[in-house]
UniProtKB/Swiss-Prot annotation:
The lineage of its organism: Bacteria, Pseudomonadati, Pseudomonadota, Alphaproteobacteria, Hyphomicrobiales. It comes from the Bacteria. This is Putative ABC transporter ATP-binding protein BH02760. Its EC number is 7.-.-.-. It is found in: Cell inner membrane.
């Protein structure tokens, strides 16, 4: 089993303390991170894959330090942004799915095999040559997730993956995340979405104020917000 460790992590931007002395270990398969806007949750997950580096303390993924092993960690930790338009870089679905794989220095045959596999897995075969900008919000998000899954990281971070979606597409993305073999760490405001997770971290003013199973954590979060 893999492990993500935060050891006395503080994150400061100017005079603003975004995270304060966070020490935690993550080992569960489905972990939700919730809290009010500005509570530090997005900064927390961005520290995991090295999108940000801690001002103080250490973050490690399976023993690799984010400050010293950035390249290895980027291969181990995938990241899905809230808005798929910030992630999809090429105009056609197949081109975009192939883009990240080519950065792994795979052969043409290996790239094609992985793209074919992921298109079939998520029932996207008919969209192979479609223009991404013509897809629905849910389809775009599925393409963005597919691109990350195809790279076979050990962990995938999702930053508000259902915020921009209607109910039907929320259910689709929820199912996709539930069926992942990788560890999923999900930032979300959607409490219904995270009810079946293994663990929930509640952030407030840069600190983890609740760390428990969903039933307990969500109840306490609602109490604090009321």
């Amino acid at each position: 089993m893999g492990i993500i460790k935060f050891d006395k992590v503080t994150q400061v931007f100017g005079d603003l303390y975004v995270l304060r002395n966070i020490t935690v270990q993550l080992t569960e398969r489905r972990i939700a991170v919730i809290g009010a806007n500005g509570s530090g949750k997005s900064t927390f997950v961005r520290l995991i894959n090295g999108l940000q580096l801690p001002s103080h303390g250490f973050v490690s993924v399976d023993g690799l330090d984010t400050k010293n092993d950035a390249k290895a960690i980027k291969h181990k930790v995938g990241f899905v942004f809230q808005n798929p338009d910030n992630q999809i870089v090429l105009p056609l679905v197949e081109e975009d799915l192939s883009f990240g794989l080519k950065n792994l220095k795979l052969s043409k045959e290996e790239v094609k095999e992985r793209v074919d596999e992921i298109l079939q897995r998520y029932d996207l075969q008919n969209f192979r040559n479609h223009a991404v900008h013509l897809l629905s919000g849910g389809q775009k998000q599925l393409v963005a997730i597919s691109g990350v899954v195809a790279m076979k990281p050990d962990y995938i971070i999702f930053d508000e993956p259902t915020t921009l979606l209607d109910l039907r597409n929320k259910r689709l993305i929820t199912q996709v995340i539930e069926e992942l073999s990788q560890t999923a760490i999900v930032v979300s405001h959607d409490l219904e979405f995270i009810r079946n997770f293994d663990r929930v971290l509640v952030f407030d003013k840069g600190e983890i104020v609740v760390d428990d199973i969903p039933l307990v954590a969500i109840k306490e979060y609602i109490r604090r917000m009321s």
